[in-house]
C-alpha cells in the first residue's frame, strides 16, 4: 500500500483494484477536494510495453480537458509507485450501477430518487430510456471530443464509464455537461489502451475487454476507430436490456455468437426498448466495419440530438436530505451484500497458483480406496502409488480449494482479460519487435499466433506449427541414491502393484496412456500414443535433476536464462500433453501439428477417423473436465513462472543488449502455449458448467477432489511401468527411451517450487519423488547404452 500521504494528498480507503494498479479515495489536504488516487505498482510493469501504456495514458490525460472525460489532476512518483491523482467519481462505474441497481435503490438515497422518478420497465434489468439516453449522449460527447483529437479508446466498456452525482442546473450549464442536469454524469476513464489513430489508420493490437470487442479485433484483423463504435453499441444494449448483447465465456464462443446472429439483434420484450434506441444499437452492432454506422451518423442520430427534459419538477431528494458526495457508492451498501471488494474491476491473477484460484471449483475431498495388492518381481525400484498419491498433498489441495474462488469468467456473462495473459503477450511482442534477429521475425506468423485464431477457424491446418523449434535442454545429473521415506512408500507400493497387474500394452507403441472413465454401466477406454517427436530435445541429452533457483542480474547470460526457461518449458510441455488428452475427449478435433503427439486416438475398437463421436454423459464430462482444468492450471503455472524469469531478465537487460534469437524463439513458444492452454481451459470450463447444470444436485456434490499432482504422478508412473515392460521385452527401444524421458519430466514438474506459497509437497514427498526420478534416470542411462551398442553393431 502507498504512503498515507502523497504530496498534498492524503490517501484513504481502497475503492478499486486492477491488474497493475490499486485505486484509493483521497483528498487534497489544502483544499479538502476529494480525489481518486490510482497507484500503479512499479514492480508489475515488467517490460517496456506496460510502461509505455502508462506513459501514453498519462500523456493523453494531461492534454484532455473535457467534462465527460475523467480529469488527471496531478502525477506523483515514489520508490514503488506511480501515482495518478484523478477526478473522483463517487457513484462508481456503470457496470456497478446496472448490476447492483436493486441494492442501491434500497440503500443509496440519491439512487432511490433517480429510479423512483425514472423507473425501469417492470421485470427488466435495463435502465429507464431517459437514463439510457442521458448516458449515451454524454458518451457521444466524449467520443466526439476524442475523435477531434484522433484518439481511439479501444477499451470502452461499462467498467470504464464512471459516474458522478448530478449537479445543479447552473453548475451543469457552466461545466458544459451534456444530457439531463438532474441525472448522474458519465465520464470515460482508463486510457491505458488508448492510442492516437487518425481516421485512415489501422491498428492490429489485440486489446480491450472481449464482451465489448469488435468482431474485426476478435478475428485478429486490422481495425480503425470504428471499433469503438461497436463497443458503444454493446454498452448501449447493456444499458437498455441489462445484459451484454452476446454473452460468452471466451473469445471463441463470443465470435461464434456474433457471427451466428448475422446482424439480427434480439431484444427481450420485457425490456421495452424504444424503436429509436433499437435502431441506434442495430446500426452500431454491424459485423462488418464498413457497414457499421459512421461517427458522423452516430453523432447526428436522433437519440444523440434529442433534448432531454425532466419528466416532472419533483426533486430527486427531499429538500431536507443531502448525500455525502465523499462516500463511495459501495460504502452505502451493507458489508454482507458486497460479495467482492473488486466487483468493479477487471481482475484475475494468472500468476503462479493464482491460475488455480481462477479455474478450479470447490470440491470435497474423497480418497480413492481402490487397492489391489500385487507384486512384480522384475521391477525393484519402481513401486509407486497410483491411487492414493500424496495424501498430504491432497489434504493441502483441499484446504486451498475450500477458500472462496474468483471465477476466470467474472459473474456469468463477463469475460476477464487476465493480467498474466496481458503480461505474457506484452513481453513476447516486445521481444519480437526488438530487433532480436531474423528468426524472431520469422516466428511472427507461427509461434506467436494466439490459439483462439486457429481454434475459431472452420478449417484447420495440420502444419500450423511445423516451423516451431523445440526448446534446448542442458545436461544435468541424476542423483544415484536418495533414501525413501515412509510418507509415500506405502501408498506407492499399493499403486505400483495395482498398475503392474494390468495387462501389457500393444506392441510397437512407445508410450501408451490408458484413460479409464466409468459411467455406471459403460466403460470407455481411450488410448493415446505419444510419437517420437515429443520432447525430442530431452532425448538427445542426459535427463537429470533440475537446476537450482536462478538469481537474475544484469550479468546473467542468455545461455543461463535459456537453460532455466528450457527446464520449465519442458516440464510444462509434458504436463500439457496429458491435459491435451482430456481436452481431446471433450472436443475431439482433427489432429494438428499442435497436438501431433497424439498419433492415434480412439476407443477400444477404433474408427477410421481415429475419433469416437459417441456423446459423453454429464457425469463423465464433469470428471474429465475437472481433471483437464487441473492439468491446464499446472501447465499455466509453469509457463507463467518461465515468463516471469524472462520478464525480469529483459527488465534488467533491455537497454544494454538485445535478446538472442534463441531466447526470443523460446519466449514466443511460451507465449503460444500459454495462450493456447488458457483458451482450452476456458473451453473445458464451459463444458464443465454445462454438465453440472444437467446433473442432479446429489450427483454434483459427492465428488472426489481433483488434484493435479496425483494425476501427473499416476501417469508418470504408468508411463514408466509400460516402458520397463517394453525394455525387458527389447521392444521399441527408441520409444521406450522417450517414455522414460517423459516420465522424468512429469515428475520434475511436481518438484518445481512455488515462489509465493508453501510447497504442496513436504520433504518426505519430495525425497520419494526424487528417488523415482533417480531410478528412472538410471534405467534410462542403461537403455541408452543398449541403444548405442545396438546402433554400433548395426553399422558394422
UniProtKB/Swiss-Prot annotation:
Catalysed reaction per UniProt? L-seryl-[protein] + ATP = O-phospho-L-seryl-[protein] + ADP + H(+); L-threonyl-[protein] + ATP = O-phospho-L-threonyl-[protein] + ADP + H(+)
Enumerate the Gene Ontology biological process terms.
autophagosome assembly; autophagy of mitochondrion; filamentous growth; piecemeal microautophagy of the nucleus; protein transport; regulation of autophagy; response to starvation; reticulophagy
Q: Any keyword Protein transport?
A: yes
Q: Give the membrane topology, semicolon-separated if more than one.
A: Peripheral membrane protein
Q: Where is the composition biased (Low complexity)?
A: 453-470
Pfam families documented for this protein: ATG1-like_MIT1 (PF12063), ATG1-like_MIT2 (PF21127), Pkinase (PF00069)
Q: Which residues bind ATP?
A: 15-23, 38
Q: Where is this region: Disordered?
A: 360-382, 389-408, 450-480
Q: A GO CC term?
A: phagophore assembly site membrane
Has the keyword S-adenosyl-L-methionine been applied to this entry?
no
> Where does the protein principally reside?
cytoplasm
Comp. bias (Acidic residues): 360-370
Which CDD domains does the record match to this protein?
STKc_ATG1_ULK_like
GO MF entry, a single one:
protein serine kinase activity
Q: What EC number(s) does the entry state?
A: 2.7.11.1
Q: Which Gene3D superfamilies did the record assign?
A: Phosphorylase Kinase, domain 1, Transferase(Phosphotransferase) domain 1
The active site is formed by 155 (proton acceptor)
Q: Where does the protein end up?
A: Cytoplasm; Preautophagosomal structure membrane
Top-rank taxon, per record: Eukaryota
Query: Subunit notes for this chain?
Result: Homodimer. Forms a ternary complex with ATG13 and ATG17.
**Per its UniProt record, what PANTHER family does this chain match?**
NON-SPECIFIC SERINE_THREONINE PROTEIN KINASE, SERINE/THREONINE-PROTEIN KINASE UNC-51-RELATED
Its biological purpose is as follows: Serine/threonine protein kinase involved in the cytoplasm to vacuole transport (Cvt) and found to be essential in autophagy, where it is required for the formation of autophagosomes. Involved in the clearance of protein aggregates which cannot be efficiently cleared by the proteasome. Required for selective autophagic degradation of the nucleus (nucleophagy) as well as for mitophagy which contributes to regulate mitochondrial quantity and quality by eliminating the mitochondria to a basal level to fulfill cellular energy requirements and preventing excess ROS production.
Q: What is this protein called?
A: Serine/threonine-protein kinase ATG1
Provenance organism: Komagataella pastoris (Yeast)
Gene expressing this chain = ATG1
